[in-house]
Regions:
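Outer membrane beta-barrel
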Residues: 33, 51-53, 82-99, 105-213, ...
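The canonical Cys-X-X-Cys-His
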Residues: 38-47
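Detector for outer-membrane/organellar transmembrane beta-barrel domains
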Residues: 228-316
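Outer-membrane beta-barrel "beta-signal"
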Residues: 39, 332, 357-369
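Sequence/structural signature of outer-membrane beta-barrel proteins
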Residues: 96-103, 136-140, 167-171, 176, ...
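Hydrophobic, lipid-facing positions within transmembrane beta-strands of outer-membrane proteins
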Residues: 70-75, 87, 114-118, 145-147, ...
Length: 369
């Protein structure tokens, strides 16, 4: 049964507040940053997260995420993404099997490469000027995701990024099919061209980006996009907000996001609430609501159990069009830089639209370096 239009967003907000009140002390994906009190830049070359992992990120993955570490030479520190002081490289491979069960249709099963990417970091002036490249090499033709110059003066207190990059907005989730990433249109498939200014303080991380609004689709006269995101970070919790305005002659889109993360014992929580308003000349405006609440339980070395609830109201002008999605994913890292994922997702949507009521099962192999 689908909850009422406003009940689910209210549940998400209450969950955000509730987690803040019940949080207790505790000794690429955002939950790892939340669990450890890190910023995105702690583990990634990109200050806003995603893509290539830096030396610390690779060392953390090897020593903290893997069930055991395998080294040919026990005295060796192992691979850390750095070729030398001037060059760093990395990559991600994801592939496996998926099965989609849509009511009144035959099952759709397939196996293959989900996504394969390579990263190159050229440190022209170490710790000050970097040229960064993120290229998707499969499936299909090669696709440039990020290509930018990064200037980090004052020991990284300020950041200036120019080129093509992922926009700063909401949680940097690995799953691009999450409602908050899919409906906002800001995810790993939609980089944009422009300039981003960043500020990194001990407890704050903030970014302001001015881009041309293409999201990988080519420039339009009179079109531009502005993105603003800020996060306040504490060792056991964080809260942030984002704003995005896509100014387009064919219709403007304005988006607001409230997001955060909390630790409650062994579980790291993530939550996000998005309000999206589309204004189309001649058709008026419509509001879209999307939410996510996710818990990650690292119940043993090398093991993580992820459970997610999501709600989507694709249009406040229509009734009975709400959708829900429930996900359970087990992630296992038997050795360093190798992860297996097995998951199930159940969609609960509009009775007359079978695709919004589908079930998905997947098994994935993730290799990174």
């Amino acid at each position: 049964m689908i909850v009422s239009r406003f009940a689910a967003p209210l549940v998400a907000v209450c969950t955000l507040l509730g987690l803040t009140l019940i949080a207790e002390p505790v000794l690429a994906e955002p939950y790892l940053a939340v669990a450890n009190g890190f910023k995105c830049a702690q583990c990634h070359t990109n200050p806003t997260g995603g893509g290539k992992r830096n030396v610390f990120g690779m060392t953390y993955a090897r020593t903290q995420l893997a069930r055991r570490t395998v080294l040919s030479d026990e005295a060796s520190p192992g691979w850390n993404s750095s070729v030398n002081k001037w060059l760093g490289i990395g990559g991600d491979y994801r592939g496996g099997y998926s099965d989609v069960d849509v009511p009144r249709r035959s099952d759709d099963s397939q196996a293959g490469v989900t996504k394969s990417t390579v990263y190159v970091e050229v440190k022209a002036v170490p710790d000050i000027l970097t040229f960064y490249f993120d290229e998707q090499v499969s499936p299909g033709n090669s696709l440039g995701r990020e290509r930018y110059a990064l200037w980090t003066p004052a020991r990284g207190k300020y950041t200036v990024k120019a080129g093509q990059f992922f926009l700063p907005y909401g949680l940097r989730l690995q799953d691009d099919t999450a409602f908050v990433r899919q409906r906002s249109g800001i995810n790993f498939d939609t980089p944009d061209d422009g300039v981003e200014l960043g500020l990194e303080l001990p407890k704050w991380s903030a970014q302001l980006a001015a881009t041309n609004g293409t999201a990988g689709g080519g420039s339009e006269p009179g079109k531009d996009q502005t993105s603003l995101s800020a996060t306040y970070i504490q060792p056991r919790w964080r809260v942030g907000a984002s704003y995005n305005l896509n100014d387009d002659p064919r219709g403007d889109r304005t988006m607001y996001a409230l997001f955060g993360g909390w630790n409650t014992g062994p579980i790291a929580w993530l939550a996000e609430l998005d309000l999206i308003t589309d204004d189309v000349p001649g058709f008026g405006s419509r509001d879209i609501y999307a939410t996510l609440v996710e818990g990650n339980w690292r119940f043993g070395t090398g093991h993580n159990l992820k459970a997610t609830y999501e709600f989507l109201d694709p249009s406040d002008a229509a009734s009975e069009d709400e959708q829900e999605r429930y996900s359970v994913v087990w992630e296992h890292s038997p050795i360093q830089f190798l992860q297996t994922r097995v998951g199930f997702r159940a969609y609960n949507g509009v009775p007359g639209l079978p695709l919004t009521n589908r079930d998905e099962f997947f098994a994935e192999l993730h290799v990174y370096f």
